[in-house]
C-alpha cells in the first residue's frame, strides 16, 4: 500500500500453514515487485533469520556481509535504477539479548525507582547492553568498509541497527553518509516501541550525492515491536 519502489525487511519469515503467510501469499500481495532476494543470515545451528529485499527495479546481485553473528546479518545488493547502479545494504545488527525478565526489571525501575532496585537493575542492564554493543562494533566496521569500497557512487544503508544515533555503531556506519531522519524527519523518530524502551534504532542513510526527504516513522502497522521507517530519495 505504501507504493515504495524498494522494500527492505528484517526477520523475514514465511510458513506453509493456514495460520501464517506463505511465500506464495507474500508474492501475491507484493506482485508489484517483480524482483526479490531472500537471504538466510547468521551462523547459529537451526537459525531461521532471514533478510529480504523486494524491488521494482532489477536486483543485479546480493551478498551476505562477512561478520560474526549467530542470528543477525547484513546483505548488500546492487540495484539497477535507470542508467545507475545503486549499492543498498540491508541490516539487522546484533540484538541486545534482553530477556523478558530483564525487561520486567527495567519496567520495575521506572514504576518504582527505589535506590537499591535502580542500582542493581541498572548494573544488570548495562552489562547486557555492553556485551551486545561489543559485538555490533566489528559489524559496524565491516559495513563501513563496504561503504568505502563500493564501486558505485550512489549508496543507501538501512535497517535495524539495534543501537541509538549516538552509538559507535551509528557513528561508524554513518560517517560518510547522511541520516534521512536527521535530514528530513520530525520529532524523536522513535522506532522501537515495546517495554518502555523508546529508542530510534531503525535507520535509512544515504550517500551525500542523494537527498532524502519526508522521512517518516510510520505507526500504521502495530503488530511489530518496530515501526516501519520510509522516505523519498532523489539525486542531489
Q: Which sequence ranges carry the predicted segments?
A:
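N-terminal signal-anchor transmembrane helix
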Residues: 1-2
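Extracytoplasmic/secreted proteins, especially bacterial periplasmic and envelope-associated proteins
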Residues: 21, 25-28, 49, 124, ...
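Short C-terminal domain-edge/linker segments immediately following a structured domain
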Residues: 39-42, 83-84, 96, 117-124, ...
